[in-house]
């Protein structure tokens, strides 16, 4: 009995490790805007659903008409995060998955980017709403029903073109298309890869069509921190895309193929979006930020260090100067995996001091490729001709062949 009692006492004194049960984290898709909350939920649902669907050897005609649709009806459940009733419809899921793959986008990374609340950004065009993903890799744009219809027609030609070109294109990279229904209101949203860099600041921005009539930025637009300027502003600024003969040849080959493709589809209204990152200006900004940090440290040292001087190796200022110098040297480095639209100027791409000229990084892409030249556009062209005269080269609305020729000539003249 004594032995049993001793054993029980020994066991009672033995320390037992307590295990805390870890529950898997659940995405809440919490957002102030219910539409964006549903968008994030929809991306998460549709991408995860695709992970269980076999990748076909080739896409069939039905894949360009297919869709996935889900209706959610909740009662007193998760209402603090999502609307009680909503619908999500994804168009052509297999087609867009294939496009993402061809553009080198992993679905897991795509999911991570778009299940964090995006932020609203200043629209490049009137009417549509634009959002930027939290990591700045993707742009979400709202579409009209007419644009969605055009997108379906365009997609049937766009996908084989991307395949034939091995994704070597300046056309928008369309990655997903959704219809979201919240409070009985339907919204269409398309996901596009961001033309600009996630880490390199764009200091100047132009939207170029190659036409001259009514092609100046408005006074309201110019009030923005980085306004979107237009053709006449570009010419007045005397800007040149300085990438050299070899760079020009490669760019014009890609641009020529894209524009020929659009012209054959009777598409007009597209433009070249040009963003310019000024490396010298970025360097100045980085040095100014460094100087401000050092100033703050000096104020802190004089007020709170008690007059005790640190030796140089221990000084936080010394460490900060080294890290700031490294930051400045890395300030304008292109990431080839992310900055796919980036082209360095001749001076930026060459060794230090070997080539004169502006140290710029250019971001270029064709935008707005869903305007079909039909009866409405023909009427618009006639109206503008009456107003401005028969100078077709100066009017933005023109027949597809004239539009493409003028567009390419303008860009060709802008490159040196």
Predicted regions and their residues:
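Active-site-proximal segments of catalytic enzyme domains
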Residues: 107-175
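Residue-level recognition of beta-strand microenvironments
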Residues: 177-179
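Long, low-complexity eukaryotic regulatory regions
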Residues: 1-128, 162, 171, 181-416
